[in-house]
């Protein structure tokens, strides 16, 4: 329950895309929030680009997708080449979604849009403010922050670290960041190019010189990412970028007007747990991996989408310990799969073994044409295949639920949605009404087109589903499921 003894419900550390999105969602739900950022302003670099279909769906449910679509370059194809010869071209059009494409939006634009949305909700970023310490005591967290040499103490019901790979929150919690560094140097560059390549096609290229990826940002602007043997200067020059393209990419690409470039090394690391008491970590603070696949920012945004409704219920006195602990239990397997997938992709595209290269160049053209491979590839990359099977607060596979009624910010609170089909008999509906009497403000009922019953979580994932033979006993099963994650005094509303 919200305490008058705390200064804020949620203190968020870090105002990158993940922290900004969490702040927006806290504000949308009416939670008191404070968002601190060590930098003096938002990023001016493009950094992360790809926003995948599941993240677009989440933005839609949060009511903020429109400005992102207006700024995006839409990508619907993935081309795979080896030694400058095309091996495969996969049509990236996942079914069962409103957004069957990848939206390319530079990170500086993403941050600016999220800041604008936060201002509309009455929130703000506290720049030049760093976290010094955080200690949990007496049912809240006492933090010390520093701004321009002055330290102050604050209290929060919860603290969430979205403060990147060098996370202060993670260090304060003494959470090991387990993994390793890739033994290669990477370069990236944003350049203007001629229009040889389609603006809606992402390129994954391999060669004897190493891997290279080309992300289309607009008709003639491209992000180039590649391994490089050694750094030449403080940052890659236009000549270096052109050399990379000439060696590894499809022929005929000419780069000019270098906008931004950088060298960097990458790691694959993750923490063993995402929560310690009332403190949580998300995004790069909790996991980092290869940039091939463009999964980093999307995974972080989905972290906080999983977390925020649980914090909301906890602040309102409805969510219990098991609900909060489910954040780590649900997200860690997803993070592990992302790390494994991006690691495999990096190895496949970057292997220097002649035998492995020959095998790759032979196998990819064959398997990439198989519908089963394309479906799995698209489901993994898009985020639409994420599920929470094995979660302590889910019975079943925990797949995402797609329905137009969950769009455009219509679900502005943290209630479950119980969908009952017309085939449900009177006794089942009576059992649902009795459940309603016990769980007001926690579960919302609607009559659904599909038969049976489906319990959909506030984040759009299915907590429980039963087909067209639903019975009153299924309502009691759902009651037990809800009771395990909420406090008994929780109540529920009805739309019968």
What are these regions (language model features)?
Residues 1-9, 13, 28-29, 97, ...:
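Helical substrate-recognition/capping region of FAD-dependent monooxygenase/halogenase enzymes
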Residues 44-119:
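Active-site-adjacent segment of FAD-dependent monooxygenases/related oxidoreductases
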Residues 70, 116, 158, 162-266:
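Conserved FAD-binding catalytic core of PHBH/FMO-like flavoproteins
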Residues 6-8, 149-158:
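Core beta-strand elements of the Rossmann-like FAD/NAD(P) dinucleotide-binding domain
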Residues 127-141:
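A conserved short coil-to-beta-strand element within the FAD-binding core of flavoproteins
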Residues 27-47:
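Glycine-rich FAD pyrophosphate-binding loop
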Residues 235-299, 319, 341, 395:
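FAD/FMN-dependent oxidoreductases across multiple families
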Residues 19-20:
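N-terminal Rossmann-fold NAD(P) dinucleotide-binding loop
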């Amino acid at each position: 329950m919200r305490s008058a003894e705390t200064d804020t419900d949620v203190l968020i550390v870090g105002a990158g895309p993940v922290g900004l999105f969490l702040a927006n969602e806290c504000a949308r739900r009416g939670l008191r929030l404070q968002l601190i950022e060590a930098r003096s302003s938002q990023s001016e670099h493009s950094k992360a680009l790809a926003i995948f279909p599941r993240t677009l769906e989440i933005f839609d449910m949060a009511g903020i997708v429109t400005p992102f679509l207006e700024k995006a370059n839409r990508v619907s194809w993935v081309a795979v080449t080896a030694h400058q010869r095309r091996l495969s071209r996969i049509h990236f059009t996942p079914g069962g979604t409103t957004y069957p494409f990848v939206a390319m939006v530079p990170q500086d634009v993403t941050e600016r849009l999220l800041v604008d949305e936060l201002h509309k909700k009455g929130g703000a970023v506290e720049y030049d403010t760093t976290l010094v310490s955080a200690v949990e005591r007496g049912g809240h967290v006492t933090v010390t922050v520093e701004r321009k040499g002055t330290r102050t103490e604050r209290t929060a019901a919860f603290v969430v670290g979205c403060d990147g790979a060098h996370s202060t929150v993670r260090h304060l919690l003494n959470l090991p960041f387990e993994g390793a560094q890739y033994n290669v140097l990477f370069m990236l560059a944003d350049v203007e190019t001629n229009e040889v390549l389609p603006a809606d096609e992402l390129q994954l290229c391999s060669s004897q010189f190493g891997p290279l990826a080309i992300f289309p940002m607009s008709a003639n602007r491209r992000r180039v990412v590649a391994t490089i043997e050694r750094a030449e200067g403080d940052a890659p020059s236009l000549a270096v970028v052109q050399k990379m393209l000439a060696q590894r990419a499809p022929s005929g690409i000419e780069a000019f007007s270098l906008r931004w470039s950088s060298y960097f090394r990458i790691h694959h690391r993750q923490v063993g747990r995402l929560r310690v008491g009332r403190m949580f970590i998300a995004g790069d603070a909790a996991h980092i991996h290869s940039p091939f696949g463009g999964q980093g920012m999307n995974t972080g945004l989905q972290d906080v989408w999983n977390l925020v409704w649980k914090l909301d219920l906890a602040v309102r006195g409805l969510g219990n310990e098991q609900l909060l602990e489910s954040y780590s239990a649900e997200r860690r397997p997803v993070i592990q799969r992302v790390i494994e997938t991006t690691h495999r992709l990096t190895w496949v595209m970057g292997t220097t073994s002649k035998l492995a290269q020959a095998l790759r160049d032979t196998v990819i053209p064959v398997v990439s044409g198989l519908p089963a491979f394309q479906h799995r590839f698209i489901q993994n990359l898009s985020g639409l295949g994420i599920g929470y099977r094995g979660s302590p607060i889910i019975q079943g596979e925990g797949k995402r639920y797609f329905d137009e009624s969950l769009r455009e910010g219509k679900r502005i609170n943290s209630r479950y949605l119980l969908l009952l089909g017309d085939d449900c008999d009177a006794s089942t509906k009576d059992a649902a009404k009795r459940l309603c009497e016990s769980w007001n403000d926690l579960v919302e009922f609607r009559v659904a087109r599909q038969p049976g019953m489906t319990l959909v979580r506030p984040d759009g994932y299915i907590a429980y589903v039963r087909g067209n033979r639903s019975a009153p006993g299924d309502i009691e099963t759902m009651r037990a499921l809800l009771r395990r994650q909420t406090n008994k005094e929780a109540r529920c509303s009805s739309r019968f």
